[in-house]
């Protein structure tokens, strides 16, 4: 008969193994050509090689994060009720939104909460996450997915809203220059356009088309489809950014590390509810870092030496 202590160790090992598998499944692409000049917009110049996630963080991945760090309590609102509601009449953020799908359900009681990705949404990018939730996810990965370790690591979140990336961060939210370079930069000598920056983040100057998920068109994207139109990551496999990343235009806005207007953080890429114009390199948005939105997610970056 197995002893309780052994069963506990086995359970912990199983949990850690599952987390390791999740990390191993993360696909990363390399953004090279160190020291490239910035675009005419002023963005995109990066002095070093780095990697960026090929896809945005998914509902399934974020639910695993919640299961690890927010089962006992959730003081930082890493999960919000909007994630588990289908129709939201008031987000409490100055506007009315309807027909917003669920993404993650929470069951149980404090101390034993369980987070369940909605099956039809588990491969979609997670949404309803704040900028600070994205940083805490980065800290969790930086710390090796240890239970509850979200307040330090890649970022020190004990010092208020003015957080900065640690010099020893293993993973991080990309800066605007990093994200912009990954999305739009391709040297002319390697097939890029004049000036080495594309207008849209799928290697094209041509206006993208709003196509159904699964389209093989090289300039397809998810936009003008409403909140319920958010598609699984990688739904447009041939619409790649120059570095090979997917979904950098449309589907969900992505949180950027860079601050603007003192208290805001940059958003890039456009989203399913917005039109094609938001996918352009000269378009940036911003939002309050402590708020969560039904069309905003994130992806992370790391050093090229990983």
Give the residues covered by each predicted segment.
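Bacterial N-terminal signal peptides
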Residues: 4-15
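Short, polar loop/linker segments at the starts of domains and inter-domain junctions
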Residues: 37-53, 211-223, 244-246, 277-292
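Disulfide-stabilized, aromatic/cysteine-rich ligand-recognition loop
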Residues: 20, 44, 235-241, 260-306
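Active-site-proximal beta-strands of protease catalytic cores
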Residues: 249-259
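Active-site microenvironments of metalloenzymes and redox enzymes
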Residues: 44-45, 51-211, 260-261
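Short, well-ordered junction/capping motifs at the entry into regular secondary structure
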Residues: 161-168, 213-249, 285-288
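Bulky hydrophobic/aromatic "packing anchor" residues in well-ordered structure
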Residues: 31, 36, 52, 62, ...
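GGW-centered surface loops in extracellular recognition modules
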Residues: 21-40, 162-164, 168-171
């Amino acid at each position: 008969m197995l002893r309780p202590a052994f069963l506990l160790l086995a359970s912990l090992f199983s949990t850690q193994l599952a987390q390791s598998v999740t990390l191993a499944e993360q696909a990363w692409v390399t953004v090279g050509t160190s020291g490239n000049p910035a675009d005419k917009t002023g963005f995109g110049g990066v002095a070093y090689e780095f990697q960026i996630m090929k896809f945005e963080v998914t509902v399934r991945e974020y639910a695993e994060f919640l299961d690890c760090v927010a089962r006992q309590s959730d003081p930082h609102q890493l999960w919000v009720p909007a994630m588990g509601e289908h129709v939201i009449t008031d987000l409490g953020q100055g506007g009315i939104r309807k027909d917003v799908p669920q993404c993650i359900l929470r069951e149980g009681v404090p101390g034993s909460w369980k987070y369940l990705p909605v099956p039809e949404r588990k491969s979609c990018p997670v949404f309803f996450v704040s900028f600070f939730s994205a940083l805490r996810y980065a800290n969790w990965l930086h710390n090796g997915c240890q239970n509850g370790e979200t307040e330090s690591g890649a970022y020190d979140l004990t010092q208020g809203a003015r957080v900065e990336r640690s010099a020893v961060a293993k993973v991080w939210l990309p800066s605007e220059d990093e994200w912009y370079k990954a999305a739009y930069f391709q040297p002319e000598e390697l097939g890029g356009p004049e000036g080495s920056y594309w207008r849209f983040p799928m290697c094209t100057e041509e206006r993208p088309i709003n196509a159904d998920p699964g389209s093989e068109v090289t300039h397809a994207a998810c936009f003008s489809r409403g909140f319920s139109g958010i598609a699984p990551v990688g739904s447009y496999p041939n619409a790649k950014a120059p570095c090979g990343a997917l979904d950098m235009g449309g589907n969900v806005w992505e949180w950027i590390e860079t601050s603007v207007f003192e208290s805001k953080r940059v958003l890039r890429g456009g989203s399913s509810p917005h039109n094609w114009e938001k996918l352009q390199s000269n378009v940036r948005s911003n939002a309050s870092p402590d708020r969560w939105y039904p069309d905003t997610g994130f992806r992370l970056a790391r050093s090229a030496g990983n």
